[in-house]
Amino acid sequence: MNNFDDLFTAGGEKNETKSERSFNKEEWAAKKQQERADAFELLDTATKEAVENCETFRDYLLVQSRFGRYSVSNALLIAYQNNEATYLADFETWKEKGVFVQRGEKAITLLEPGNEFTREDGTTGFSVNVKRMFDVSQTNSQRNYSRREPDERRVLKALIASSPCDIRMTNELEGNVCARYVPEDDAIYIRQGLDGYDIFRSLSQEIVIANFAKDGVSREDCSFTAYCASYILCERSGFDTGDYNFEKAPDRFKEAEPKTIRGQLDKIRDSANEVSQDMRRAMEEQQKAKPTEDINELLIKAIEAPTKKEKRKADREGR
């Protein structure tokens, strides 16, 4: 009779080895640490490339305009890995939607906050995890996530309502200046007879400058930030951005460390998002407004309407 006892012994050894290898906490932690290190290295590379020339800088701003809720770091990572991305989700989320990632597609590496922890000095911090995402263009979905063209008048009304100060029409602005915030008057002066594009482009920039002025920041110190934020706002609102010129942008970041660069980009993102949020609230309030008004009539009404500052004052007095 053949003896098959050795099969059980071998099998037992194999199962034990498999069990031992099923999860090794130290190996897993080391792997995750390496993933984070690689992701941060990728982020620094993406940051440097974004400000390397005017084209890559514009690409970054365009991505940030599409992904307004994403951090600067993640917008930089998206711009570096797939600057045409429009809608991202991880593999499981796409699967839950009944959508499948196409074979051979490379994931887009992003960063997400992890668990809260306490540092040695007692302060609170958050760990960072690596997230693998896929754009809709990498799936079998036929859905189009491109931005819809908004109603121009509705958007302009919302922008006008978002101003933190008075808006006054004038024909006395010098040269080709379309709008100008004057701190002494706490007002934005805008040229009469402008078309929708010129109103939005110039007014959005001056609104950002006016917002900075409330915090004591001069025009000279925020003009570039306001210019870039205006580009993002134009992109989000469907206005042409072909006239924006970023040829001098790389010089502003020359010799700067990646972290410093991201700090400057944070100001651009936050400035654009502040105006976007104010516009969104204004649109919600104006859902039932008549859309047949002339653009310059909107400016006249804006002059007569209470500003955000006056509304806050009225709210305080009403309490």
Model regions: which residues?
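N-terminal accessory/interface modules of nucleic-acid-binding and processing proteins
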Residues: 1-318
